[in-house]
Every structure is written in structure tokens, then in C-alpha cells.
Amino acid sequence: MIIIGVVVVIIFILIVGWRSASQSRQKEAIRLATTTSTENSGLLEYILPEFIEKYNREVKVIAVGSGKAFQMGKDKEADVLLVHDRAGEDAFVEQGFGQGRYDVMYNDFVLVGPMDDGLIRQDEQRDILLGFKKIYQEEKAFISRGDDSGTHRKELRLWSAVEIEPESGNYISVGKGMGETLIMADEQLAYTLTDRASYLAMQEELDIGIVIENDALLFNPYGIIPVSAEGADWINQEGGQEFIDWICSDEIQEKIGQYGVEEFGQALFIPNHQ
């Protein structure tokens, strides 16, 4: 009987070990291609530990511009995209590269620049198109991200809306993320377009400030997209869907809405999954 008992215990241990190993294999990391704004703002650092602990699954964050994130999705180098270029997101899904798009949150863009040069009057602080016109007409320095990010794409659409092609020596395209672009604009006392979250997260380091905000044209929605696994069996569909369900859950939506309130007196992102 003792021998039988020992055998049963050994079998039980082997089964448990096999199941544990199997579960470990299933919990492969997911590759999240996302914008630099979600990283620069500190949002991902704030929410991701909860996902990792709950699901025992690592998240490999690749923070790039939205354009680069779309390309990574097309090349099957990411499992999930968290981006902020609605036109690009819709096209990505319509072309079959993504399996749907889900609202996650939004904030807005703001124009930042030197506060004391008098370019933008108080009654003009909600008119982004007028601001862009005046920057061009007065030959003020403007730093463009120039990286095909969601922010860069938004900036180009604003220039197009005022029928201006900014190619003068005062327009500097740097090919950098939001944080580096803000630092360069600050050093050169130049203007730049930024998402509000990135600016607020860095404002203590900057002398430039918000000169135009709260224009409806500056609305900035973020969407999450699972990358299609067609022709790419290495795409982590299970982990990707797990992440999407998690970030869209009531619990994490509430957490997103709390981020920044204590430090900045306002949420850096407004949850809007429905």
C-alpha cells in the first residue's frame, strides 16, 4: 500500500508539473506596438503591472510613432496596436491587417510655445488654424516630430487645412518622439504640437507652455487593434485578446481615468470604451 501511495503521489506531482509547464508555455509575452505618448506620459508604467500580475503574461512595449506601429502590424511584428490616428486605424482594419478597432480613451492636442512673445492673443487661444497661420506668417520657429506619428499626421492635416506647406528654414522636422521634440522646442523657444498628456508629464522641465487649447479640431482618440494572424501563426491572438479585454474592462477604464488627477489636478486620459 505504501508503494502504491508513493506512486500515486509521484503521478500527481508529474501531472501538476505538466499542467504548470503547459500553462507557462501558453502565457507567452505579447508585443504591444504603441505611441510614444502612452510611454512618455507614464500611463503604461502605471497600469501594466496589474495586467502582468493578473495574467502571468509579460508585455513587450514597443513605443514608436503610430505610422511605425501600423507598419509593424502589417509586418506581423506586433500582436496588438494602441495608437492615435483614427484615419490610419480605420484604413489598417479595412485593409485586413487588423481584426477590429476598439475605443480605449482620448485626450487632446495642444499647441505649446514661448509664453511671452505675444504671437497668440488671449482671444485667439482656442483657434488652432489661426495659430498655425500666424506661426507661418510671422516666421516663428516650429519643431515638427517628422516621424509619421499620430501627432505628426495631425500636424500635417492642420497645415493642409490652412493651405500651407511649411518648408521654410523656421520649420524643423526632427524625426523624434514627443519627449525629445518638446525638449528641442523648449531649447529653441519654438512652437510644437503635442498631446496634452506628454506636455503635462514634462511641464516641470519646460519653459514653453500651452498657447492654444480646447479647439474641437484638437480631439485625440486612442484605439486598440488586434493584429490579424492570417498567414502568421506566430501572432499571439490569445494574449492579444486577453490584453484588449483587460484594458477595456470597467476596472482598468476607471484606473485610466484616475491617472494624473492627483499629480496634475486632471486626468491625462479620459476612458471611453463602450
Predicted regions and their residues:
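Exported/periplasmic ABC-transporter solute-binding proteins
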Residues: 1-54, 67, 71, 77, ...
